[in-house]
Amino acid sequence: MHLVAGDSPGSGPHLPATAFIIPASSATLGLPSSALDVSCFPREPIHVGAPEQVAGCEPVSATVLPQLSAGPASSSTSTVRLLEWTEAAAPPPGGGLRFRISEYKPLNMAGVEQPPSPELRQEGVTEYEDGGAPAGDGEAGPQQAEDHPQNPPEDPNQDPPEDDSTCQCQACGPHQAAGPDLGSSNDGCPQLFQERSVIVENSSGSTSASELLKPMKKRKRREYQSPSEEESEPEAMEKQEEGKDPEGQPTASTPESEEWSSSQPATGEKKECWSWESYLEEQKAITAPVSLFQDSQAVTHNKNGFKLGMKLEGIDPQHPSMYFILTVAEVCGYRLRLHFDGYSECHDFWVNANSPDIHPAGWFEKTGHKLQPPKGYKEEEFSWSQYLRSTRAQAAPKHLFVSQSHSPPPLGFQVGMKLEAVDRMNPSLVCVASVTDVVDSRFLVHFDNWDDTYDYWCDPSSPYIHPVGWCQKQGKPLTPPQDYPDPDNFCWEKYLEETGASAVPTWAFKVRPPHSFLVNMKLEAVDRRNPALIRVASVEDVEDHRIKIHFDGWSHGYDFWIDADHPDIHPAGWCSKTGHPLQPPLGPREPSSASPGGCPPLSYRSLPHTRTSKYSFHHRKCPTPGCDGSGHVTGKFTAHHCLSGCPLAERNQSRLKAELSDSEASARKKNLSGFSPRKKPRHHGRIGRPPKYRKIPQEDFQTLTPDVVHQSLFMSALSAHPDRSLSVCWEQHCKLLPGVAGISASTVAKWTIDEVFGFVQTLTGCEDQARLFKDEARIVRVTHVSGKTLVWTVAQLGDLVCSDHLQEGKGILETGVHSLLCSLPTHLLAKLSFASDSQY
């Protein structure tokens, strides 16, 4: 049609503009049955001249109805294609009019086309699914949706605009001038437009033109919840209806709330975005300058190119002198979680991608080092090429390793040279040490005649190493090697002559200046209890070469000392620049994770639990405030659900990984062909150094009463309170054995071996088991039995007590064993405890 500017014809031609009138229903049109492409319709020729006039001098415009097919054959044609949807507005081809899809009007005319401002242009259009309310035409008519009001609901919490000429967008916030070309501020917002786009779908035989322009409701992505929180579909629909305001509109939401984030709790509560800038302003604090950090601690320009499954060689943190085959088990930012091939995940450890402790495959052969093969492989038969083929794995490329920089070796330090070094685990002690390995610019310090668990790598400027004779000059005691014949009269000259070694020259040692960290400076540090996490931390205290780390918001019981050049501390912003998640400080009002809800997110990559999970304990939450359930105090598992496994619980501070993984660790050490820990007899008269092996407890065995032995070894599992008397436990077991209800506990306590033998034979009907108990019990009564034999005998009795065949009479049998132990002399009980500690 032609638009006429006025009712007079005018002498000059009018600028034409083309528009399409979309009927409310295609049923009123005589539409052809064949499908025609909209682009094939010839445009109406432009007539320059006066329009037709009718009575009243009212201009009449010719109406052009495009031929639209509603038949099934028109699957590729829809009325949406009549408009060119560019960004938030849709101008018709060749025209200046613009149509806009607003939040409450499916299609309205916005005015003459004007180029949008660069600030409002957004790339990409989000597609939405069908399911919106009925649409009307460009004007508000009877086809207006019932559940969509004509005007947007007023928000009582929203401040009114300052004047009539400006209005504020509900989505993005900035004020814009209101005008006919922009409609409302919400209409011109590209953010809302991307949330209210229209998809082009195939039209069916019953689909009308108006139905094709329905505003589509964006279906909110369902948040992952635990099985205990998930409901059935009808319940979910009811809650969705409850989430609307009284006028039927859904409550306001942001893109952040609509996108699932695994870092958010399963309850759907959104945490405020944390930033260093706002936190520093709030705390009135400063961050540690980047200049205080080493290159290995600061942000690197190299990208972490390691991928999951890549294999490499690396140093065992627990045995720094040994090299193992490792596999990249996890990549997080610029950090790696490495796994020992053939061993349990409880030995996994984290390193930075630029760590000098990792090397490419084949490095040990070129450098002459010894590589420990995976569990089950023989050292002489191991081959990298064959191993990669058998595991179908890929070796990490050499260019990813910083160790390939070929740094020059430290001058003056050679393998076998002697020096004095500080024991890192006992910093008050300085011991006789040797250089046992040199790699690039670092060397390995080993304490003479000790195992390699106390070795550490350092460089010539380390403050923990000193030249020979340093302790004598400083007036400090020097701890001689283990097994040294005369430790009180240790002499360096004599020791060097005996070992045929030489001392590291004094000029080879470099002096490292003290660090410049100050108290209360902010930084980012790895949580030693859960090494997968990096937290916001502060400098609590300083020494010349160490700093004390405190995690903001946490108790000071988690503070620890760390070297100022340790790779586990980073400047503020390191996580954001490397893509690693940062754990914000624990706020004073942050609720405990023990609040009701589903399973906590185990990590930033956690997946939702299945609906059919039947283990209710899995949906518990750790009661430690601020703990999200990730990690485990033993290092064996990636998650925990109770306080006993929480690595952040104060009562678990003294627990070590090795205490609960002795079996795995022992099996791992047995497979190490190149590691045989030497036997070290006790050394009396040495200088102050605590032994590096397990001490045999020296308790006063006179205090070990038979009751204590009974409660520690043979207390019934049915007794929930070990401090109860024996008679109470007897009453519990009598409930399982109605036939002995008339026998009192005091009577059983006085039974002889033969009486217990008869009871066991009657109970089980097996004379062999009864005779076994009788024979073993008589052996215990031998006064001149050795400690190991005594332990073995009592262990046999314990196995008999725990036998499946004797579960019914377990309480009575325990009472009989207790009576047997009570009859033992005190020195035999001492032997029992001593031998138990020695053997186990």
UniProtKB/Swiss-Prot annotation:
MBT repeats lie at residues 274-374, 382-481, 490-585. Zn(2+) binds at C622, C627, H640, C646. The modification Phosphoserine is found at S117. Changing W450L: Abolishes binding to p53/TP53 monomethylated at 'Lys-382'. A zinc finger (CCHHC-type) spans 613-656. Residues 127-269, 580-605, 657-697 are annotated as: Disordered. Changing F340A: Does not affect binding to monomethylated and dimethylated peptides. Ubiquitinated in a VCP/p97-dependent way following DNA damage, leading to its removal from DNA damage sites, promoting accessibility of H4K20me2 mark for DNA repair protein TP53BP1, which is then recruited to DNA damage sites. The MBT repeat 2 specifically recognizes and binds monomethylated and dimethylated proteins. In contrast, it does not bind trimethylated proteins. The MBT repeat 1 does not bind methylated peptides but inserts a proline ring in a Pro-Ser-Ser/Thr sequence context. This is Lethal(3)malignant brain tumor-like protein 1. It comes from Homo sapiens.
